[in-house]
Amino acid sequence: MKMKLVTAAIMGLAMSTAMAATDATSLTTDKDKLSYSIGADLGKNFKNQGIDINPDVLAKGMQDGMSGAQLILTEEQMKDVLSKFQKDLMAKRSAEFNKKAEENKAKGDAFLSANKSKPGIVVLPSGLQYKIIDAGTGAKPGKSDTVTVEYTGTLIDGTVFDSTEKAGKPATFQVSQVIPGWTEALQLMPAGSTWEVFVPADLAYGPRSVGGPIGPNETLIFKIHLISVKKAA
């Protein structure tokens, strides 16, 4: 979070605080409605992020800044306060992220350890696991080939994060342009096959977060139907 964004967010929360005493029925102009909407949205975000701010003092700062009154803190003092706030917030977010990554890794390892002994599960040296649902008889793709597939991706708790069914059409891509777990599995699948593939975190997105339901070090499960293979020229 850059300093300007931090300052803008605090100002927005102050707007929300200042408007809190105003009856909602008095929001008669577009300016009032916009001001309140921005303030309320930022206020909710601050609350969700656990940022502890005194709304009354914040509103006082906004009022002084807008009126041109003598500020209680100097510009240098405010710069130092905001800089510390930014550093503390980043440290907190980093600690939360690392904790989540460790938890996801432990859960994923435990899941894969239990899953590997289930009937029909094949475990590869890389740690990738798969189960053949329907065995196809077509060609197997190479790394440079293009495939068309239908798939559903879930977390180990069953949360669906992606699906071609939702998109309404199959996906087409080069085998080498997907996560390592997919690249490895696809090269073993004959066209026409349907597999359930269990992808360890290090063969998926690893310790980074890609947004949405997929957090750091998530083990992912895919049901993949390989429709066709187009050989590279």
Swiss-Prot record:
It comes from Legionella longbeachae. Belongs to the FKBP-type PPIase family. It is found in: Cell outer membrane. Strongly inhibited by FK506 but is completely resistant to cyclosporin A. PROSITE patterns: FKBP_PPIASE (PS50059). It catalyses: [protein]-peptidylproline (omega=180) = [protein]-peptidylproline (omega=0). Residues 144-233 form the PPIase FKBP-type domain. Its main location: membrane. InterPro entries: INFPOTNTIATR, PPIase_dom_sf, PPIase_FKBP_dom, PPIase_FKBP_N, PPIase_FKBP_N_sf. Its EC number is 5.2.1.8. One of its GO terms (molecular function) is peptidyl-prolyl cis-trans isomerase activity. Essential virulence factor associated with macrophage infectivity. Exhibits PPIase activity. This is Outer membrane protein MIP. Keywords: Cell outer membrane, Isomerase, Membrane, Rotamase, Signal, Virulence. GO terms for biological process: protein folding. SUPFAM superfamilies: FKBP-like.
